[in-house]
């Protein structure tokens, strides 16, 4: 574990493909254990919002990086929920608007922005007990994390989860289309040049296809608690 004063910090990395349940599980475990949950996707959304609010083109890498360098992105736990702050302002809702959602992929693909976010993610992980989820946390962002989990699940089960999630939000999309989208996303994530989706050699693989959220939370929590005792 990383040492902070007389205390030791725990780093938990959860990686895996889209809709494998990473964020849902990570949020619950972070809340239960009092860890900071670092939503790496929200960080790229924050960068996109910074560009938007400053009327900068989403492909202008240098301008966006200059703005991000002058900004602060923070996560705070408030009333059991994680809030995202940019320059002291709560932007938790602002980063989820259609405008930001439609353009975050372009911003997150910028090499210097990814490098900057990885730097910030490591900085955050050096100050708190953290649980972080993404595609390359255990391999790139936190290669020395005490606990590394790689969640997998069948395309069919992941598509069904996303389908139900969409239904709850009033979004209607054909299940077969969702399955296709996930297959395409899997290919892109595992073949991209910068930080591709890859299981770390020392990660514990957990198939969530036939597991409930509570069962996944229990299994990962047990792994973390065993590591804390060592």
From Swiss-Prot:
Classification via InterPro entries: Cytidylate_kin (IPR003136), Cytidylate_kinase_dom (IPR011994), P-loop_NTPase (IPR027417)
GO BP, one annotated term: nucleobase-containing small molecule interconversion
Protein's UniProt name: Cytidylate kinase
EC number: 2.7.4.25
Predominant localisation class: cytoplasm
Domain of life according to the entry: Bacteria
Cited HAMAP family: Cytidyl_kinase_type1 (MF_00238)
Keywords, alphabetical: ATP-binding, Cytoplasm, Kinase, Nucleotide-binding, Transferase
Keyword rRNA processing annotated: no
Catalytic activity from the UniProt record: CMP + ATP = CDP + ADP; dCMP + ATP = dCDP + ADP
An example Gene Ontology molecular-function term: ATP binding
Organism: Lactobacillus gasseri (strain ATCC 33323 / DSM 20243 / BCRC 14619 / CIP 102991 / JCM 1131 / KCTC 3163 / NCIMB 11718 / NCTC 13722 / AM63)
Binding site for ATP: 16-24
Pfam families reported for this sequence: Cytidylate_kin
Subcellular location: Cytoplasm
GO cellular component, one term: cytosol
Similarity comment: family membership: Belongs to the cytidylate kinase family. Type 1 subfamily.
């Amino acid at each position: 574990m990383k040492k902070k004063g007389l205390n030791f910090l725990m780093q938990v990395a959860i990686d895996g493909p889209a809709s494998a349940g990473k964020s849902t599980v990570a949020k619950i475990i972070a809340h239960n254990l009092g860890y900071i949950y670092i939503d790496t996707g929200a960080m790229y959304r924050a960068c996109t919002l910074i560009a938007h609010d400053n009327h900068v083109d989403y492909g202008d890498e240098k301008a966006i990086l200059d703005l991000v360098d002058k900004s602060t992105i923070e996560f705070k736990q408030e009333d059991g929920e994680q809030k995202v702050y940019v320059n002291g302002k709560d932007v938790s809702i602002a980063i989820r608007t259609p405008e930001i959602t439609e353009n975050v992929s372009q911003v997150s693909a910028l090499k210097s922005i990814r490098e900057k976010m990885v730097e910030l993610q490591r900085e955050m992980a050096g100050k708190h007990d953290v649980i972080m989820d993404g595609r390359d946390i255990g391999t790139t962002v936190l290669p020395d994390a005490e606990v590394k989990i790689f969640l997998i699940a069948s395309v069919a089960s992941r598509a069904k989860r996303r389908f139900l999630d969409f239904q709850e939000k009033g979004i209607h999309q054909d299940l077969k289309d969702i399955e296709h989208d996930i297959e395409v996303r899997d290919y892109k994530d595992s073949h991209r040049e910068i930080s591709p989706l890859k299981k770390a050699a020392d990660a514990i693989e957990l198939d969530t296809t036939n597991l409930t959220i509570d069962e996944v939370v229990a299994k990962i929590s047990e792994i973390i608690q065993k590591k804390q005792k060592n």
